[in-house]
Design a protein with these regions (language model features):
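Hydrophobic alpha-helical transmembrane segments of integral membrane proteins
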Residues: 85-109, 169-185
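Interfacial segments of alpha-helical transmembrane regions
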Residues: 1-16, 68-93
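Interfacial loop at the N-terminal end of multi-pass membrane proteins
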Residues: 2-64, 107-126, 161-164
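Cytoplasmic juxtamembrane regions at transmembrane-helix boundaries
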Residues: 69-88, 153-173, 177
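Transmembrane helix-loop junctions and nearby membrane-interface residues
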Residues: 17-27, 67-74, 98-102, 147-157
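A generic hydrophobic-segment detector
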Residues: 110-165
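Membrane-interface elements of multi-pass transporters and channels
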Residues: 33-37, 76, 103, 112-113, ...
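Core segments of transmembrane alpha-helices
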Residues: 58-69, 138-143
Length: 185
């Protein structure tokens, strides 16, 4: 069960990261476009990113998968902290940054028309682009924390890696027999 939950969380978070990375890669060119070209792109290119298409469901599914994974690893302290850190990053990206910064710009672009471009177009364009850049940073941090939570191994009780046994785990009892006791002199 745990391996499937980890796989789902990684895939969904990677897809979310990919969607936000696409926006960041496009940002330099889009900021240079004329307002009419930019508005045409906004109203045609990003239709599949939003509701009712698949893009709108990937990010909430990633958040649910990561939070569910946190529940499954709740007894593994390091994995739990990393997984919950990932969840916090994803929850900051959506809904916090999205609804405070991105959605107001989306609402502006939904009502703006090419024939009557509003005078306050540029601040909304920058708000939309930079909010997606912020979301990308949060998604990247969330994915990195999630990957670390999957890659770390639980610590064995009272053990450490021994350079003398080829890196095999040595228990505290084995260490006391194999290492010389310090001289009292």
């Amino acid at each position: 069960m745990l391996i499937y939950a980890r796989f789902a969380a990684l895939i969904l978070t990677a897809l979310t990261l990919g969607l936000s990375f696409a926006h960041v890669l496009e940002m330099p060119a889009k900021l240079a476009y004329a307002p009419d070209v930019y508005l045409a792109l906004q109203t045609s290119l990003y239709v599949s990113f939003g509701s009712p298409n698949v893009g709108a469901f990937v990010e909430p599914a990633a958040i649910l998968a990561v939070v569910s994974l946190g529940y499954l690893v709740r007894r593994r302290r390091r994995a739990l902290w990393l997984t919950m850190g990932s969840a916090v990053c994803l929850l900051l990206a959506f809904p916090v940054v999205f609804f405070i910064f991105t959605e107001p710009a989306n609402a502006f672009f939904r009502v703006a028309h090419l024939t009557s471009l509003p005078a306050d177009f540029e601040p909304y364009r920058r708000q939309w682009e930079y909010s997606h850049a912020a979301r990308f940073v949060l998604h990247a941090a969330g994915f990195a924390l999630l990957a670390l939570s999957v890659l770390i191994r639980p610590r064995a009780a009272h053990s450490e890696l021994s350079p003398f046994t080829g890196g095999a785990i040595q228990t505290q009892r084995e260490r006391s027999y194999s290492s010389p006791s310090p001289s009292p002199y």
